[in-house]
Regions:
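Short beta-strands within extracellular/lumenal beta-sheet-rich domains
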Residues: 34-45
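Beta-sandwich interaction modules
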Residues: 43-44, 75-105, 111-116
Length: 257
């Protein structure tokens, strides 16, 4: 089940992940505004990167606060993230992921009104440095537009009757790699619960992904990103990757190998 909330629009380009341990106590700068509100900012630079996205091992925002990410030229931003995006609470902390910011710098900006006493917990554990168009592990070597001749794009004439259904399809991105796909399912209650169906092999356990997730022992997919509307704009292959919307995080309800 997807635990995600809308996090913004961006393009799919990145590939190499670097481990770090930055949080609001050992990185960034705090500023107290004249009205008592607080602002925490942090700039991350990854020289020569085409894009950057961040993974968090701990993420929690108090109600009433907000977090934005934006590029250094301020042409692209993401957020605001709020308490709605929390996967856990301030005690039972869980991870998080944010999508791609184009360029070699990303700026985080956290805003906390003066009347809020609790401070957010934002701990960054990985910086994904994009150095080439999105490429998956060895088993998934094709990039955007590299599908075979047998592939029929959704915007070909054959897809005319599936234009509503295509909105349920998402590309799964894990640690900067284009990883798998899946689709949203409805329930008999028609309650819009975000149930997402994908293949069991998309839960890891092979190649570079030796961590295997399952519904019983390891169900939290907090670092999984879901990219919507990832499609060719026409029937032909190739072209530029689309502007897309992304959501993050899910919990495995059931799986079967």
């Amino acid at each position: 089940e997807m635990t995600s909330s809308l996090v913004g629009s961006e393009m799919c380009i990145r590939d190499r992940s670097y481990t770090c341990q930055w949080d609001m106590t050992n990185a960034g700068n705090w500023t107290v505004l004249t009205n008592g509100d607080k602002l925490w900012t942090m700039e991350i630079s990854s020289p020569n990167a085409l894009s950057i996205n961040l993974l968090y091992d701990k993420f929690w925002l108090p109600e009433g606060t907000s977090l934005f990410l934006y590029s250094k030229d301020k042409k692209q931003y993401m957020g605001g993230f709020t308490s709605i995006n929390n996967k856990g609470d301030s005690i039972n902390l869980k991870g998080f992921a944010t999508g791609i910011i184009q360029g070699s710098n990303v700026i985080l900006e956290y805003y906390q009104p003066a009347h809020i006493s609790q401070t957010a917990i934002i701990s960054i554990c990985n910086v994904v440095h994009g150095y080439k168009p999105i490429v998956a592990p060895a088993i998934l070597t094709r990039s955007f537009g590299g599908s075979g001749n047998c592939q029929v794009n959704i915007n070909c004439p054959e897809g005319e009757d599936w234009q509503k259904e295509k909105r349920a399809i998402a590309l799964i991105v894990v640690n900067g790699f284009r990883y798998a796909t899946g689709a949203l399912l409805n329930t008999t209650a028609n309650d819009k619960r975000p149930i997402f169906l994908t293949a069991d092999h998309c839960l890891g356990g092979w190649g570079n992904y030796n961590i295997k997730y399952d519904a019983v022992t390891n169900p939290n997919l907090n670092h999984y990103m879901f990219y919507w509307n990832y499609e060719s704009p026409s029937c032909s292959r190739g072209g530029s990757e689309p502007q897309i919307l992304s959501t993050s995080g899910a919990t495995i309800l059931a799986n079967n190998e």
